[in-house]
Swiss-Prot record:
It comes from the Eukaryota. It comes from Bos taurus. Interacts (via LRR repeats) with TLR2, TLR3, TLR4, TLR9 and probably other Toll-like receptors. Interacts with CYBB/NOX2; the interaction is direct. Interacts with TGFB1; associates via disulfide bonds with the Latency-associated peptide chain (LAP) regulatory chain of TGFB1, leading to regulate activation of TGF-beta-1. The gene is NRROS. Residues 1-19 form the signal peptide. This is Transforming growth factor beta activator LRRC33. Keywords: Cell membrane, Disulfide bond, Endoplasmic reticulum, Glycoprotein, Growth factor binding, Leucine-rich repeat, Membrane, Repeat, Signal, Transmembrane, Transmembrane helix.
Amino acid sequence: MELLPLWLCLGFHFLTVEWRHRSGMVTAASQGGCELLDGVADCRGRNLASVPSDLPPSSRTLLLDANPLRTLGNNSLQRYPFLESLSLHDCYLERIGHVAFQEQARLRSLALPDNALSESYKETAAALHGLRGLRMLDLSGNSLTEDMAALMLQNLSSLESVSLARNIIMRLDESVFEGLGHLRELDLQRNYIFEIEGGAFDGLTQLRHLNLAYNNLPCLVDFSLTQLRSLNVSYNVLEWFLASGGEAAFELETLDLSHNQLLFFPLLPQCSKLHTLLLRDNNMGFYRDLYNTSSPQEMVAQFLLVDGNVTNITTVNLWEEFASSDLSSLRFLDMSQNQFQYLPDGFLKKMPSLSHLNLKQNCLVTLHIREHEPPGALVELDLSQNQLSELHLAPGLPGCLRSLQSFNLSSNQLLGVPAGLFANARNLATVDMSHNQISLCPLPASLDPGGTPGCVDFRNVASLQSLSLEDCGLEALQDCSFQGTALTHLDLSGNWGVLNGSIAPLWDVAPTLQVLSLRNVGLTSSFTELDFSAFENLRSLDLSGNALTSFPRFGGSLALQTLDLRRNLLTALPQRAVSEQLAGSLRTIYLSQNPYDCCGVEDWGALQRLHIVADLAMVTCNLSSKVIRLTELPAGVPQVCKWERVDMGLLYLVLILPSCLTLLVACTITFLTFRKPLLQVIKSRCHWSSIY
């Protein structure tokens, strides 16, 4: 007992020391309002007016983004000589002291985007010139001109990555990037560049990635950056792209010319490693078959290139611009949103490695599938939103789509496809033929691939998983329409009467279907077989836009997660038993735009508690010719509904019968009371003389 006070004192002492130690750790972790972790000081958005002076001197990364610093003084960073990365994004910087980075010999990355460095660019340039080891510099969003940028980049020969995006640069010449022999990545997007003088990039022998998107370049002629691997010139006003002639080997792998005004297919290098070519949203077309080109002189264009005192003339064959281009390594080609009316002979044959071809939203009317076209490596082909009325398959090519996995033919004018087009398509998983007026073949189509039958046959395409036939004007399906397939996604929306009173045509794919869309197909509750119990793997079911008056039937182990019943004729919500069954798996249900009776929503509370009604605020019901939101339904509605359920004829009879009986009794009493006087009055009034 005598030792107890001693133990208590020692325990209190150790607890005090531990509390102080932990408090010190917490303070260190958030010193000066900044978060510290493994040499990184995160001071972003702290409303700091100057660089904190109480951070660990050994900090390697300092993040000061979104602070109103305005000025970076000469001594602001003197305490942090080990900095390797400094970020000053959106700090309202107008001035950087000329020796602000004097102690930062280890600095490798400097981010200064979205400031106002153009205000004192000369002093800023002087400060940057001391960073001999800098590798990454971000000057985007500083309202810099080309002269300002040239001064700031002067003598920074160690730079490997530079961003000058979102400035006001208009012209580029050899002086802007002079001495940047190690530069590998240059971002010039979102400027006002309309001219690039010859030799502007000649000194950038290590340049691999160049971004010129969102500028005002009218053309790129005599392109000769052989060392470049990716070039982005999207969102300009390019009308021509011509690589330099000769057999020089280009390292170019990705070329983005999308969203320009190109009229002709670009003249690409004769020897390159190009694997991605993006030509979306231009005005391109092939013209050889559209004009009378009997004279060779009518088929060429000459470009006069003036560079100082040197004049070069480049002659281009307008009708065969792709003939000399090296497309052997091309894997991804996007030609969507152009004016292509046809593909010339041999065009696709030059691309044996092509795996993705996008020809969406062009003017194609007829497509001839010839030998080795499409290439055997083709995985995805998009021909949607054209004017295709015919597909021609060369004889002897029934398995030309053997590698194809996705085939999009939607929004065309097709009535059918060549017989055998899908034969031996062992990998075909997705087909979209929506918005074509096609019909499904009642019997296997003819094996003659020469013509185009007026139907399409998907049977026995074992690899097919997703099929879209929306708004195809399909007639009633036969029971074997999808026999031999393992569909997981099926869209039959917009085909009124396609099921003809029964979902039996879908039984072949019922065990595998996961997503089924039957929107606007004319379903009614009078269907004798509108029972989805056999669809045990169904995850999503769309029954909107039909004429259902009651809930469809579900049974067995239900896996349904999404159910859409909008725009039907439902007057009552599902019964409690159905709601409890759906609650096990259902995550989302749509119930709005139905003429519900407010007296038929007794189970609304139970359904609401499940929190699965996605359009809860839009569900309404009718009560005494009024439309009321279910969420605003008053508490007294059940009493009103009890009165509305009473037979009104019986009610009127009960109200009128006592009144009639009372009136009859009153009349009888009156008659009996005044019977004798009344008879005398009648006799006196009706008395007349007799002739006798």
